[in-house]
Amino acid sequence: MTRDTNSNVGRRSVLKAASALGAFLGLGGVASATPGREPGPKKDEIIVGVSERVSSTEATVESKIPTNAEIVHTNETLGYVAVKFPSNAAEQARENFKRNVLQEDDIEYAEDNATYETLEVPNDPMYGQQYAPQQVNCEGAWAETYGDDDVVISVVDQGIQYDHENLAENMDGSVSDYGYDFVDDDGDPYPVSAGENHGTHVGGIAAGGTNNDTGHAGISNCSMLSARALGDGGGGSLSDIADAIQWSADQGADIINMSLGGGGFSETLDNACQYAYDEGTLLVAAAGNDHGGSVSYPAAYDSVMAVSSLDEGETLSSFSNVGPEIELAAPGGNVLSAVNWDDYDSLSGTSMASPVAAGVAGLALSAHPGLSNDELRDHLHDTAVDIGLSDDEQGYGRVDAELAVTTDPDNGDDDDDDDDDEDDPGDGECGDETNTATADGELSGGWGGNPSDTYSYELSTDNPCHATVTLDGPSSGATFDLFLTLDGRTPTTSDYDRRSYNWGADEEIEVDLDGDEELGILVDRYDGSGSYTLTIEELGS
């Protein structure tokens, strides 16, 4: 089975079991950390990812590490290990290991166990009155639903004060202590100090108690899980964050909020986000606070919905990152929410905008419980309000709770739309126009062999809507893999947008098109040799 095909499973809290059993089973393929492993950032570690064809992740890597290094963490589900070098090891030693291990069979990637940070911007001492729920029209949504407690939002962040006066009633009691602590590797995600406020504040925005005569109004009354992956200082390791994402999906979270970023592109984090998306979870993340810089990861991954920040006047926040990955905008400047201990404060950052969008997603899913994650994502796009910013600043627009709840996802918000747009060629069924291209090649190993071929393909139909890339290789004795990019860059085995890699030499990738893509294709030899035929079928409407 390929990993690039989204399953779009509708999550309806599939693991609502007894607390202790739910917590035990929820850790699935996440191995315990080595005793004594320091929490938080892990600059001395290298993460090594392996092919999903191997039977044991740890055994595959163990024989390939230097004698002064050790495997300190394993995640069999995501297929990676963390290899720790001594703190006094030369930087070049780690770089040499990353380069050399990539030459080994079944090794997919090697990268630093980077540090990600909370995306909070320090606020002024003057705090404005709460405005975020009003800006996204929560009142109209609340007339229909305050949020269903069967809808679960997992907050991957610092710990949440789960007994906070305005959060306790919305914590998901199906899991012991309402979550898991990946920083300290224990079952209690409670914050360790009063200053560890970020997770409590973010959680209070998405699912703080509403209409309960207490404190502030959160966006929704959906249930909430705390996946503590960032430590007291606001930083967290790549492996802890990836494990927290996987765990959240395995717990049945419908929505994962990630108000964090800053570590750059990571195969491990990309795989974790794609894993959760394939499990049916909608992932929402903060765009970043680099004052107009490019969208940070994990928000920039295809599987994640990136959210920019607005101020009270619906202008783009000065700190907000922008770019083509932005899908929604939401209020993020001076947002009032809960903080430790049973207190309240206003904070600013795309960290605050992301949980607003996550909370609206929770309201929408409460009103339309049959939606898959893909359908929910599209519905939030369709019901967003254009506030006059550029696409790179607002994406589809400012998220709107009332429209997301009251608009029928099947019919849209205007019954006359179909009649008005009958002549729009983009509204035809996908497949009215077809273009097919083929190429033949041969791959072989050894000295002077040809281990891979690359191709580029420009869309040619009037309104491209779908493409299928098919690789037909030798019937036996060879294993070929197929990689695809959507922006014209040349794909590699570590830089791609879609991939298909099975045993054997026949692969296929299907992708929906918006019309502005240019396909880059890599046919790569994993084992064996032989001839192949590459076929691209483009459909237009």
UniProtKB/Swiss-Prot annotation:
Residues 403-453 are annotated as: Disordered. One of its GO terms (molecular function) is serine-type endopeptidase activity. Optimum temperature is 60 degrees Celsius. The lineage of its organism: Archaea, Methanobacteriati, Methanobacteriota, Stenosarchaea group, Halobacteria. One of its GO terms (biological process) is proteolysis. Induction: Expressed and secreted during the transition to the stationary growth phase. Is probably up-regulated in response to factors (metabolite and/or regulatory molecule) occurring in high-density cultures. Transmembrane segments: none annotated. Dependent on high salt concentrations for activity and stability. Strongly inhibited by the serine protease inhibitors diisopropyl fluorophosphate (DFP), phenylmethyl sulfonylfluoride (PMSF) and chymostatin. Also inhibited by denaturing agents such as SDS, urea, and HCl guanidinium. Activated by thiol-containing reducing agents such as dithiotreitol (DTT) and 2-mercaptoethanol. Serine protease that hydrolyzes large proteins such as casein and gelatin. Cleaves preferentially at the carboxyl terminus of Phe, Tyr or Leu. Is also able to catalyze peptide synthesis under different salt concentrations in the presence of dimethyl sulfoxide (DMSO). Residues 410-432 have a biased composition (Acidic residues). The keyword Aminoacyl-tRNA synthetase does not apply. Monomer. SUPFAM superfamilies: Subtilisin-like. InterPro entries: Peptidase_S8/S53_dom, Peptidase_S8/S53_dom_sf, Peptidase_S8_His-AS, Peptidase_S8_Ser-AS, Peptidase_S8_subtilisin-like, Peptidase_S8_subtilisin-rel, TAT_signal. Its EC number is 3.4.21.-. It holds the Pfam family Peptidase_S8. Optimum pH is 8-10. It is an enzyme of class 3 (hydrolase). This is Halolysin-like extracellular serine protease Nep. PANTHER family: CEREVISIN-RELATED, PEPTIDASE S8. One of its GO terms (cellular component) is extracellular region. The active site is at residues 157, 198, 351. Residues 1-33 form the signal peptide. Residues 34-121 form a propeptide. Belongs to the peptidase S8 family. Residues 130-405 form the Peptidase S8 domain.
